[in-house]
Swiss-Prot record:
Residues 96-132 have a biased composition (Acidic residues). Signal peptide: none annotated. Residues 1-74, 91-132 are annotated as: Disordered. This is Sugar utilization regulatory protein IMP2. Residues 1-29 have a biased composition (Polar residues). GO terms for biological process: regulation of transcription by RNA polymerase II. It comes from Saccharomyces cerevisiae (strain ATCC 204508 / S288c). Present with 5110 molecules/cell in log phase SD medium. One of its GO terms (cellular component) is cytoplasm. Controls the nucleo-mitochondrial dependence of galactose, maltose and raffinose utilization. Becomes essential in the absence of functioning mitochondria.
Length: 346
């Protein structure tokens, strides 16, 4: 078949100006035929895409089932190590499923791990779970408060229980002389600082640079942190700095004296509790108002270079949230006693 362009001459005759030879005949394709052909092509592409998606989904489902089985095994192994009181065994956890899959699926596993990052829980979250706590408490055949810290001659529970009657007798003995050794100073900007040095025996040894800083908010958990610090971390001849930050400027000096008195009575009680092990010790009680308590702590750490900064977990979650310093932080948490009621946890 030829395609040509006709040129009409003045005499009325026509001649071929240009012609193109076509090897295949051309056919006219209507709209309905074009639509039908497009549907067939799209159907084939959808079928191929569906097969590919089904393969990927089956692979992801198998991978998710394998990861879920591994997570269940890890949770059971974690609970087993906690109940056997051997947390070091968690360092040897091996993922058997990942070894069986081989090295060929490392890239696919990396993609799958990215999706499971939000679902995974840390060891602390699993141990601190309510169900786990109940199961762990059932397996423990002794009270954690019955432990005896190195500097105490009695258990923690006995130290805490003896505080109220001992402090009551101590307050009677110093009645009328509560503020004798407390120094109160007015600082620039209208800020106030109250300080008292409490010495046991000969005090801190000359040349002994070991010291600790305890940041307290006068709560019961902070008192427990002080008890743990005095019973487990302090050595002979050390110095302990107890820092309390008063958030509001007091209208009179009685508030600052009261803050020092609340800390002093617990320190004196702990002096009596550690008398069988520690003879010489210094404790500096400090209560003050300051615009930037975190900056104050960093300056004290830079100047005193303590062994560690000790505080309660409630302080870490409130006042010292996002706090960073150059020394280790010892966060002490007082686990509250739960009343076991039948039928509630079942």
């Amino acid at each position: 078949m030829q395609k040509s362009i006709l040129l009409t001459k003045p005499d009325g005759t026509q001649s071929n100006l240009h012609s193109i030879k076509t090897e295949t005949p051309t056919t006219v394709e209507f709209d309905s035929e074009q639509m039908e052909r497009g549907h067939r092509e799209r159907g084939r592409s959808k079928k191929k895409r569906g097969e590919r998606d089904s393969n990927v989904s089956s692979l992801s489902r198998s991978r998710s089932r394998a990861s879920s089985r591994s997570r269940v095994r890890e949770e059971e192994f974690l609970k087993w190590t906690v109940l056997r009181q051997d947390p070091s065994m968690r360092l040897r956890v091996v993922d058997v499923d990942s070894e069986e899959e081989g090295e060929g699926n490392d890239e696919d596993d990396d993609d799958g791990d990215g999706d499971d990052m939000d679902e995974e829980e840390s060891d602390e979250e699993q141990v601190s779970d309510i169900e786990n706590d109940l199961e762990i408490d059932e397996e423990f055949h002794y009270d954690l408060g019955m432990k005896v810290l190195p500097n105490f001659c009695t258990s923690i529970n006995e130290v805490l229980d003896s505080s109220k009657p001992w402090i009551a007798k101590y307050e009677i003995s110093i009645r009328g002389h509560e503020n004798e050794d407390v120094s109160l100073e007015q600082l620039d900007g209208g800020y106030v600082r109250a300080m008292q040095l409490l010495t046991k025996g000969a005090g801190a040894e000359a040349g002994n640079q070991r010291s600790f800083i305890l940041y307290t908010d006068l709560s019961s958990e902070s008192t427990y942190a002080l008890t743990y610090l005095m019973g487990a971390a302090v050595n002979q001849g050390d110095t302990v700095y107890i820092v309390h930050w008063e958030p509001s400027k007091p209208t009179d000096d009685s508030q600052m004296f009261a803050n020092v008195a609340r800390i002093r009575k617990h320190v004196m009680h702990l002096f009596d509790c550690v008398a069988g092990v520690l003879d010489d010790l210094d404790v500096v009680v400090l209560s003050l108002t300051h615009p930037y308590p975190k900056h104050l702590l960093n300056e004290m750490i830079h100047g005193l270079k303590p062994v560690a900064l000790c505080c309660s977990l409630s302080v870490i979650l409130s006042t010292l949230q996002n706090f960073v310093c150059s020394v280790p932080i010892l966060a002490v948490r007082k686990k509250l006693k739960r009343a076991k009621r039948k039928g509630i946890s079942e």
